[in-house]
């Protein structure tokens, strides 16, 4: 990517197998194999927030009817998603929409670097799947109380929203329905460990996303109202 230099967040990199059980690579190979006989309308790719969504009833209610595939892996950062995309996870399918939700695990990277990583993912999806739209979900606030990572995620969202204005088939969706209370805290009812969503927390996120997906699919079928380049 021009202008990113040696940005580690935009350099495709596999996860280092520090535990020695090969699970990450096994999941990657399974995703590639599972996609060979599928015809999904929507593909989700990202970290644990994507992965755990698949276990909720709302996934079966909203996204299974779209023949959605879930390529979420816990702990993934932008550079790991880039590597997976470069190594076959979109090779055998032609989805209409690719949903990307990743970046909160890029702990050691600046907001600008994380934004560069997300932009690199969008560009790669555009290259590999030019017919597909890309929906980037905004990073959620994290931590029970205000903290630097929460602020960095907010900065990433601002930067990504602005950056995607230059991509006509990319859309940004602020996935936060208001998880931060007026006193600055996040409830464990919404995020059970103040990072991962509970079933209650997933509900408003998934319903807002589902509404956008239906609008985009209808628009591409000539039935919808034209959308701006980024969704509010």
Curated annotation (Swiss-Prot):
Residue ranges, annotated region (Disordered): 1-20
Uppermost EC category: hydrolase
Annotated GO MF terms: 1-alkyl-2-acetylglycerophosphocholine esterase activity; identical protein binding; platelet-activating factor acetyltransferase activity; protein heterodimerization activity; protein homodimerization activity; protein-containing complex binding
Activity-regulation annotation: Beta subunit (PAFAH1B1) inhibits the acetylhydrolase activity of the alpha1/alpha1 catalytic homodimer.
Disulfide-bonded cysteines: none
Pfam families: Lipase_GDSL_2
GO cellular component: 1-alkyl-2-acetylglycerophosphocholine esterase complex; cytoplasm
Keywords: Acetylation, Cytoplasm, Hydrolase, Lipid degradation, Lipid metabolism, Phosphoprotein
Tissue and organ distribution: Expressed in brain, spleen, lung, liver, kidney and testis. Not expressed in heart and skeletal muscle. Expressed in fetal brain as heterodimer. Not expressed in adult tissues. Expressed exclusively in granule cells.
Gene Ontology biological process terms in this record: lipid catabolic process; spermatogenesis
Stored SUPFAM superfamilies: SGNH hydrolase (SSF52266)
Residues that bear N-acetylserine: 2
Primary residence: cytoplasm
First and last residue of the signal peptide: none
UniProt-annotated catalytic positions: 48, 193, 196
Residues annotated with Phosphoserine modification: 2
More details: Originally the subunits of the type I platelet-activating factor (PAF) acetylhydrolase was named alpha (PAFAH1B1), beta (PAFAH1B2) and gamma (PAFAH1B3). Now these subunits have been renamed beta (PAFAH1B1), alpha2 (PAFAH1B2) and alpha1 (PAFAH1B3) respectively.
Task performed by this protein: Alpha1 catalytic subunit of the cytosolic type I platelet-activating factor (PAF) acetylhydrolase (PAF-AH (I)) heterotetrameric enzyme that catalyzes the hydrolyze of the acetyl group at the sn-2 position of PAF and its analogs and modulates the action of PAF. The activity and substrate specificity of PAF-AH (I) are affected by its subunit composition.
Annotated protein name in UniProt: Platelet-activating factor acetylhydrolase IB subunit alpha1
Organism (species): Rattus norvegicus
